[in-house]
């Protein structure tokens, strides 16, 4: 694996586990097995530039995985339940949810820089576009589909954060349980 890719992969895992501010430069260097010069060679603007690269990498990974799941299941409900079941399985197997949430990486940053905010917003826009398209394919209006997509993003992201905070997969199970009613009620609009 190329050095830059290895740095991004290692830093992404560290940022997801400990948050952006929870990972110091020395820890990054040690875990990535690189020198400070190597880090700044690949990321001249330092740790924030690395965070943005991690967010872009996560964006590709998350949207690719969601697209794969959604292409495999014919209905929004089945696809969403499969996605949540996968998240629950990962949490129950490892005690964490790596690779699907960015809030742990940036939540402690009261004021995000514009490039970090843009990278986060892009990820959410991309996942919401996948949700929205699946809903429109099922006959939801564009307006309803977009509203449900935002709500679904908030439910899933919130469910993941609650799983971590409560040390339980129950919050995501609850999200999965309320989805059928949410979709039925919204389709009536």
Language model region names:
Residues 90-93, 111, 133, 153-170, ...:
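Amphipathic C-terminal alpha-helical segment
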Residues 78-82, 93-115:
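Amphipathic alpha-helical segments used for helix-helix packing
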């Amino acid at each position: 694996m190329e050095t830059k890719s290895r740095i991004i992969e290692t830093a992404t895992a560290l940022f997801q586990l400990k948050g952006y501010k929870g990972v110091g430069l020395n820890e990054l260097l040690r875990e990535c097995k690189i020198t400070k010069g190597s880090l700044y060679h690949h990321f001249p603007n330092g740790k924030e530039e690395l965070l943005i690269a991690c967010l872009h990498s996560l964006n590709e990974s998350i949207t690719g995985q969601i697209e794969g799941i959604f292409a495999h299941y014919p209905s929004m409900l089945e696809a969403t339940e499969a996605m949540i079941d996968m998240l629950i399985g990962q949490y129950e197997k490892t005690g964490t949810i790596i690779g699907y949430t960015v809030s742990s990486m940036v939540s402690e940053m009261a004021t995000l820089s514009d490039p970090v905010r843009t990278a986060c917003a892009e990820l959410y826009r991309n996942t919401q576009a996948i949700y929205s398209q699946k809903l429109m394919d099922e006959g939801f209006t564009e307006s309803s589909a977009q509203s449900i997509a935002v709500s679904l993003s908030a439910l899933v992201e919130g469910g993941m954060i609650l799983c971590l905070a409560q040390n339980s997969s129950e919050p995501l199970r609850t999200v999965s349980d309320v989805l059928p009613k949410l979709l039925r009620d919204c389709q009536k609009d």
